[in-house]
Amino acid sequence: MKANSRKMATTGVKPAVLFLGLLGLVCLCSSPSAAGFRSPESLVRNVYAYYGDRTSALSSGLPHDAETIRQFFDPSLWDAWRAPTKAPYDFLVQSASWKLSAVSISILRKQFDRTYVTATFDNKGKPVTMNFILVNGPDGWVIYDVESPHDSLRAYLTQYRN
């Protein structure tokens, strides 16, 4: 025990300070990033994880709160997603209500700074295909736009903005 005390005294570091420093380092390294995802597929998978049976807040569609906006969207979409809308349906599932089948996710192409990902699923028996345009930002992958066969998320949010 004396050898350890002597060694600590010579380095000038007290055990409590060393412990707190290591604890702080572990907390910093294990905290999730404020935005983005590690892969394009994980981003799209996490979008549709919010579309369950509506028995909880986690299954009532992708939220419009600040934390979700920063995590999922490119800064150019933040204001549009946050703004109240009179939208007649949820663009990401193409319906006002949903009962989704398994979601199939595949990368269509990688082009310069963007990756195009297709998500296909059935919503109440109706086939739906959504094309996500994703960009790799400083904190990970985020949504730049989403396209349905008839519209884009950017145009949709602009059209139904209050």
Task: For the regions a language model picked out, list residue spans one by one.
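N-terminal secretory signal peptides that target proteins for export/translocation
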Residues: M1-G12
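Surface-exposed patches in mature extracellular/periplasmic domains of secreted proteins
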Residues: T55-D65
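Surface-exposed, charged secondary-structure patches
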Residues: A35, Q71-K126
